[in-house]
Amino acid sequence: MVKRMLEVKLFGIRFENPLILASGVVDMTPELLRRAHNEGAGGVVTKSIGKEPRKGYDNPTIVELPYGLINAMGLPNPGWEAFLNEFIDERFDFPVIVSIFGGTPEEFAFLAEKLEPVADAFELNLSCPHAKGYGMEIGQDPKNVYEVVKAVKDVTDKPVIAKLTPNVNDITKLGLAAERGGADGVSAINTVKAIAIDIYAKRPILSNKVGGYSGPGIKPIALRAVYDLAKVLDIPVIGIGGITSWRDAVEFLLAGASALQIGTAVYLRGFKVFKEISNGIIEYLKEEGFSSIRDIIGLALKV
């Protein structure tokens, strides 16, 4: 009964809890995804998969800061064929959301069509802030967001989630464009544009010079984005950005998030964060007199 308190259903898919492993945190082997689930994740998102293999950027690709990370990985991935071959015979008892990226609507659609056999849903990486030609340039323009989402929905019946960038003046325009294109949900936010400089070397630390900032430092930005999106959209919002504790998780749920993705906290503290956060949410629900997590979603929108 206690476990059922955290159960959510999104896009017709059952998640035993709303805490989802975010894309790009761990290697995408089936074994590691199972480990994430066994240690408390309600579902997983794979690393972003592209049409061709990508090595990614040279080290250093991550800078640790007091309140998070700046990363510029460069979308390293084995390409769709190798990924499909690795996963095609695997069977999972939890939802696997496949993240895909491309430079055009046609590339996104191609990948969705090819990877449909191994995906319970797709997350469209429309918002990578450090990979030239992929993501950010597409994801900042509502027209492009609409076209990418529509192209993918035209070739697959699987649920489609548009991952939105915070690096715009009004994120709700992106969310509404995704909804018009047929998206089943949106996830927000991706990383915030950032840079770190070595004051002695007198140069940027990352090999790519610039990257994306994640972790506790962006939580208020992410929370505002979720709040704004949940007010205007009729599709679910998945909250991402700086969730490190059950209190953070509850804030996002109250702001209108139907589920949550956790990334940087897993990188810094390991998979144990899933059970820590789940246990904290359960205690909060009991103390506040709620029987289900569904009872608190969006309560802050009603005041």
UniProtKB/Swiss-Prot annotation:
Top-level taxon of the source organism: Archaea
Catalytic center residues: 128
Principal location: cytoplasm
Protein residues bound to FMN: 23, 47-48, 125, 163, 189, 215, 241-242, 263-264
Any one cellular-component term (Gene Ontology): cytoplasm
A molecular function (GO) term: dihydroorotate dehydrogenase (NAD+) activity
Pathway where it operates: Pyrimidine metabolism; UMP biosynthesis via de novo pathway; orotate from (S)-dihydroorotate (NAD(+) route): step 1/1
InterPro entries the record matches: Aldolase_TIM, DHOD_1B, Dihydroorotate_DH_1, Dihydroorotate_DH_1_2, Dihydroorotate_DH_cat, Dihydroorotate_DH_CS, Dihydroorotate_DH_I
Enzyme Commission code: 1.3.1.14
Flavoprotein in keyword set: yes
Subcellular location: Cytoplasm
Oxidoreductase listed as a keyword: yes
GO biological processes: 'de novo' pyrimidine nucleobase biosynthetic process; 'de novo' UMP biosynthetic process
Record's cofactor remark: Binds 1 FMN per subunit.
Reactions listed under catalytic activity: (S)-dihydroorotate + NAD(+) = orotate + NADH + H(+)
Gene3D superfamilies: Aldolase class I
Cofactor(s), names only, from the UniProt record: FMN
Annotated signal sequence range: none
Functional note: Catalyzes the conversion of dihydroorotate to orotate with NAD(+) as electron acceptor.
Family listed: Belongs to the dihydroorotate dehydrogenase family. Type 1 subfamily.
Family annotation (HAMAP family): DHO_dh_type1
Assembly, per entry: Heterotetramer of 2 PyrK and 2 PyrD type B subunits.
Name this protein carries in UniProt: Dihydroorotate dehydrogenase B (NAD(+)), catalytic subunit
